[in-house]
């Protein structure tokens, strides 16, 4: 089971679009996917027509008194389940703070292997909730758009991923950056080229074009690939999903030193989780 935090520090970068769209495209490839909506705004929950909740079960999952799997519910997208966002997440971030990291690890470790992928839609900040998601996940994906501000603003996100890897979760890897809402303008092409020049293979090969089908799909409460399956943007999303499948870090060459460090960290986490359960 691959666990992936979809993270950026700002709203409007295509984070929820990437989460919902990739989940649906992965399901078309036969991969059962769970979306964990960790954004208090609940955009992913609203997109799929379920809506965020004011119940506190997700908060309880971080406390260890409820299981994430028990909170999962089916969505309109076949093969895609979701744990709804909750207004209690704001309370969790304020009250639990550092304990959120341990809570996220414990919650993710408790998930059964019922899903092939778990995609965590992070809040549009680099606060405790986002850090907790990075602690609980094996991978991170950074969605962004081909605008100067998005391109220049990606560095703090990459630095946060590196910080969590160094201090808290040595198993964490950057799976890549997904560029969306790519228009036909020279500016968009230049920004994408600059991103590839700076970050090389960390940028996914396929990009997702700008299309009115995306907001239309959100209004309809459906993933783009279900709302407009033959649209060019749906083909883009499927291409990104296929590359995501290929970028499995557990099938890549593992540095022995990093592997030992990650194994030692997991042992410490297991002891901490056991002592607080």
Question: What residues fall within each predicted segment?
Answer:
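P-loop NTP-binding core
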Residues: 1-277
């Amino acid at each position: 089971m691959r666990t992936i935090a979809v993270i950026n520090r700002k709203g409007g970068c295509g984070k929820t679009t990437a989460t919902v769209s990739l989940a649906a495209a992965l399901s078309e490839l036969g991969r059962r996917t769970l979306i964990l909506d960790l954004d208090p705004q609940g955009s992913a929950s609203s997109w799929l027509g379920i809506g965020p909740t004011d119940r506190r079960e997700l908060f309880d999952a971080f406390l260890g008194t409820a299981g994430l799997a028990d909170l999962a519910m089916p969505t309109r997208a076949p093969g895609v389940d979701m744990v709804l966002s909750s207004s209690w997440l704001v309370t969790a971030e304020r009250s639990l703070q550092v304990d959120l990291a341990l809570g996220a690890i414990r919650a993710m470790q408790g998930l059964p292997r019922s899903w092939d992928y778990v995609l965590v839609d992070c809040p549009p900040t680099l606060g405790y909730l986002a850090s907790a998601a990075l602690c609980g996940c094996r991978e991170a994906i950074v969605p962004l758009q081909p605008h100067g501000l998005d391109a220049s603003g990606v560095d703090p996100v990459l630095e946060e991923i590196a910080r969590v890897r160094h201090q808290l979760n040595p198993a964490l890897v950057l799976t890549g950056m997904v560029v969306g809402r790519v228009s036909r303008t020279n500016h968009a092409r230049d920004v994408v080229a600059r991103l590839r020049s700076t970050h090389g293979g960390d940028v996914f090969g396929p990009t997702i074009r700008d299309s009115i089908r995306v907001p239309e799909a959100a209004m309809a409460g459906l993933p783009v690939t279900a709302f407009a399956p033959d649209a060019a943007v749906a083909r883009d999303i499927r291409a990104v999903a296929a590359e995501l499948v290929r970028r499995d870090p557990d099938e890549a060459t593992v540095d022995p030193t990093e592997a030992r460090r990650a194994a030692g960290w997991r042992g410490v986490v297991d002891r901490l989780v056991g002592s607080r359960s």
